[in-house]
């Protein structure tokens, strides 16, 4: 992937939700909710403060993050559906 986000934006690939419940019931795709977790694929350099200094982002490539179901802008790149969002749209990093 050759996308380089600008400023405080990140590129996230949604992680797929389970399509089957613990009891074995298959959830049809049109009834499943959008996943609200993803993996960070790229990060911008950061946001400038009032002094013009760049403040680095708190997330890094490979982080698993939580975000709102309707956060970000969806883009298609080489057949993959990705999200471009500001770091402020992220709720948390999932620690391993």
Swiss-Prot record:
The family this protein is said to belong to: Belongs to the GroES chaperonin family.
Cited Pfam families: Cpn10
Q: What is the lineage of its organism?
A: Bacteria, Pseudomonadati, Pseudomonadota, Betaproteobacteria, Burkholderiales
Oligomer and partners: Heptamer of 7 subunits arranged in a ring. Interacts with the chaperonin GroEL.
Q: Which CDD domains match?
A: cpn10
Q: Which InterPro entries match?
A: Chaperonin_GroES, Chaperonin_GroES_sf, Chaprnonin_Cpn10_CS, GroES-like_sf
Q: Which GO terms describe its biological process?
A: chaperone cofactor-dependent protein refolding
Query: Which keywords does UniProt give here?
Result: Chaperone, Cytoplasm
Q: What does this protein do?
A: Together with the chaperonin GroEL, plays an essential role in assisting protein folding. The GroEL-GroES system forms a nano-cage that allows encapsulation of the non-native substrate proteins and provides a physical environment optimized to promote and accelerate protein folding. GroES binds to the apical surface of the GroEL ring, thereby capping the opening of the GroEL channel.
Q: In its UniProt entry, what is this protein called?
A: Co-chaperonin GroES
Q: Which NCBIfam families does this UniProt record tie to the protein?
A: PRK00364.1-2, PRK00364.1-5, PRK00364.2-2, PRK00364.2-4
Organism equals Delftia acidovorans (strain DSM 14801 / SPH-1)
- Give a yes or no for keyword Cytoplasm in this entry: yes
Q: Cross-referenced SMART domains, in alphabetical order?
A: Cpn10
The cysteines covalently paired via disulfide bonds are none
Record's subcellular location: Cytoplasm
